[in-house]
Structures are given as C-alpha cells and as structure tokens.
C-alpha cells in the first residue's frame, strides 16, 4: 500500500506541475502584421510561411500579402521549388518575437544558395477618417548600388543637397514620415550628388490614408532600365513606378508567309521607316519607341502605295515588347506581347507562342532525349494561334521537343534536341513551314536546339 500511495502522489504532483505550466503560457495582448519582400534577382517565386503554414508567395521585386497574427513568437520560413525535385526546399528561417501594434517587413536578398534576411520593424499605422496624409518609407534593395539619396517632392522642385528625405545603404529602410496627399516625383541619386541620378519617376499622384514603402531593386531581362522601383502598400500590393528616361523597345517578327517581304513604318505618311526588307521569319533588332500609343504600318518592300497591315501598341517606359505579324492575305494581324525572359535559378523556362494558319490548337511535348511521346503527356496542351502560353518550368537535362496537333501523337514539328541548365530560357514560336503546309516549324529566339 505504501508503494501505491507514493506512486499516486508522484502522479498527482506531475499533473499539478503540468497544469501550472499550461497556465503560464504567454497570452496574446494584441496583433502585429508581417510581409516578406523578394529581392533575390535570380529567384522565381518563393513561399513565405509562418511555422509550417503558408502566408503567400512573392515574385522577384514584389511582396507577399500582409498577414496579421497574435503578439507571440514564431519562426518564419522561406521555401522555393526546384524543377525536378519532389518537395519545396527550405532556404532560410527567422525567429521573430512579435510585439503588439508593430508592422514587420522581412527583406529576403542575396542568393538562393546564400540568402540574407533583414528585418524592418515599424509601428502599425492607422488613420482617422479626416486625415489628409499618407505614410512613406524609403528602402534600398539594389545590391549593385552604393549609398543612395532619396528625394520625394513636388514635380516642380529639383533635387538639391540637403532636401533628401533619406540616405540609405543596401538593406536599410528609413523612418516613416507623413506627407500631404498630392503629386510627387521620386528621384534617387548617388549619395551627396544630386546631379548623379540613378532613377527618377514620372509624376505620381498619391492619395491620403495609405502607407507605402518605396524601394529600388536590380533591373531584369524584362526591362530596359537598370533599376526597378516599386511602391509596396500596407497590404503587400506592389505598384511599378517606371523610369521615363528609359524608352520601351519593340522587336518585330514576320510570321506570315503571305505578308511577304515588308517594310515597317511608324508614321501614317510612311516617311519614318523602322525596318526594311523583313522576310518570313526575319527578326528585327530591338528598337526604341516612344512610351504611349504607337501605330505601325507594314507595306510591301520599297512600295508605299498600299498598307498591308496596320497595328497598334501602347507601350510603357522600360518595357521590352515583341510584335509578331501573322495571318493570311486579307486577314493579317499584329500581336504584341512581353515574354517573361528573366532567367531564374530554380528551373529552365519554356516560353511558347504559336501563329500557325494551317493548324488550330497544338500540343507541345518535352520528353527525355530519345524517348517516344506515345506514353507522355504534353507540357502544354491546346495552345491556340496568337496565344502566348504560360511559361513552362523544366528541370535541367537533355530533352526532345515536339509539336503535335491537339490531342494527337503525330509530330508536326520536331524532335528538337534541347540541352537545358537551370536558368536557361527557351523562347520559341510555332510557325507554318514555308514549303510544306502539312507540317509545322519552330522559330527559336533563345535556347534552341543543340547544334
């Protein structure tokens, strides 16, 4: 009986201890918010997690949605997916002890192999209904640039030393400041040199009761500008602020057999010729054009008596466009697009576009080298004419690429042997074969078949 009594006493003590421990767990007293910003130039989207639960994804030069949690402590994780692997790869983690009424931003920079996490902490901003101000912070996420001065003023005010709202090095963020709603121009210069302009925005109208982080990133292959600037609001939306000094460009491609040898003009009087003697499947250089509305006129080569195709493009500063002429006689068309040409380190990227007149929907297969497509599924199915397919993510390796008619297994084009490394971009257009209407061809603009 004595042994039983001692055992029961110990059990009771353990239970009381456990109850005491439960009652001492921290209790939330309020909320805090957090978002992550992707400043890894070579990354695709990463996932941002609280412990093991997804908060949301962030593409390069963008933020995740903001999320709000109790003021307790958490571990936040960054994960990416590498093509060819079966699970997400965790690349970084950060423990944060939340304080109530704080706003946290986690800047993820560096490389995928060696990421750096920088935590910015501020107060959660609230506004009264009658407030006429907005909150502005300025940050630095362009690793190739040194210290920068930030000027944020009325469009009529030129930058002058001493008027900067912030001077920042990479990874830093300014204190929050309240400004009256209105029109502003953001100018970024090298530190202590207001004439050495790194970036300048168009006039931007900012309304009251918003909270923004204005932040420069490294430029990418999708842009003609060396610096990208985003305004990230308090819910995590990223607003692009292009630099008007960097003009958009356009690359012209003739993908219509019937259009024939053509000249391309950018004025209705046909006096300003951009491209001359463009034949079927010719690809022009990337040509600068004005931002805004543009109209292009195609004529037979050296003959301005008739316009064979008139097509328009509304262009934004810094953007690299492509204009593909397609169709048959009497029904020519021009399709403008912005291919996602930015290489990423987690997969090879296939960018498919098709403009066939002889076939409708097509399927695209990418299979291991020397493998039949009979038992394979297409990586992209039902691609319609003049439709830019979603980028296809591929693993590294040696592959054969085929094009077939929709749901069919008979190759209309291919096999094309493509040897891929992570970061490669296969930029391709499915076209009609000039000398055989029964099959198709592929115009590779980058990442084409191995010689």
Regions from the PLM with identified roles:
Residues 19-451:
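Intrinsically disordered, low-complexity polar regions and short flexible loop motifs
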Residues 1-18:
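Sec-dependent bacterial lipoprotein signal peptides
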């Amino acid at each position: 009986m004595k042994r039983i009594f001692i055992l029961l006493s110990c059990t009771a003590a353990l239970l009381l201890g456990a109850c005491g421990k439960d009652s001492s767990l921290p209790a939330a007293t309020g909320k805090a918010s957090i978002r992550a910003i992707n400043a890894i130039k070579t990354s695709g989207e990463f996932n941002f997690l609280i412990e093991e639960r997804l908060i949301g994804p962030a593409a390069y030069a963008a933020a995740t949605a903001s999320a709000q949690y109790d003021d307790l402590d958490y571990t936040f994780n960054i994960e990416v997916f590498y093509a060819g692997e079966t699970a997400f790869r965790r690349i970084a983690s950060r423990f944060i002890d939340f304080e109530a009424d704080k706003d946290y931003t986690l800047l993820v920079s560096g490389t995928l192999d060696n990421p750096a996490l920088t935590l910015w902490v501020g107060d959660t901003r609230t506004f009264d209904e009658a407030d006429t101000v907005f909150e502005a912070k300025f940050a630095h996420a362009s690793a190739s640039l040194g210290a920068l001065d930030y000027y944020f003023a009325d469009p009529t005010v030129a930058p002058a030393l001493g008027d900067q709202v912030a001077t920042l090095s990479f990874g830093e963020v300014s204190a929050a400041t309240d400004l009256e709603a209105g029109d502003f121009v953001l100018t970024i210069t090298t530190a202590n040199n207001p004439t050495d302009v790194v970036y300048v925005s168009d006039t931007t109208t900012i309304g009251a009761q918003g909270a923004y982080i204005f932040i420069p990133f490294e430029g990418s292959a999708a842009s003609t500008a060396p610096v990208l600037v985003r305004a990230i609001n308090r819910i995590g939306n990223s607003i692009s602020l292009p630099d008007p000094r960097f003009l958009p460009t356009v690359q012209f491609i003739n993908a219509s057999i019937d259009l024939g040898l053509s000249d391309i003009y950018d004025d209705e009087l046909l006096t300003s010729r951009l491209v001359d003697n463009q034949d079927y499947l010719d690809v022009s250089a990337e040509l600068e054009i004005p931002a805004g509305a543009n109209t292009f006129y195609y004529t037979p080569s050296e003959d301005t008596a008739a316009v064979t195709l008139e097509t328009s493009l509304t262009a934004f500063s810094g953007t690299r466009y492509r204009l593909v002429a397609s169709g048959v006689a009497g029904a020519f068309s021009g399709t403008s697009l912005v291919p996602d040409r930015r290489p990423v380190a987690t997969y090879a990227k296939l960018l498919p576009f098709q403009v066939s007149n002889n076939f409708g929907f097509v399927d695209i297969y990418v299979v291991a080298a020397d493998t039949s497509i009979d038992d394979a599924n297409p990586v992209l199915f039902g691609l319609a004419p003049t439709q830019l397919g979603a980028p296809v993510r591929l693993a590294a390796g040696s592959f054969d690429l085929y094009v077939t008619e929709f749901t069919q297994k008979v190759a209309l084009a291919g096999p094309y042997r493509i040897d891929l490394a992570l970061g490669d971009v296969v930029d391709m257009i499915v076209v009609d074969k000039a000398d055989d209407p029964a099959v198709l061809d592929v115009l590779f603009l980058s990442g084409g078949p191995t010689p």
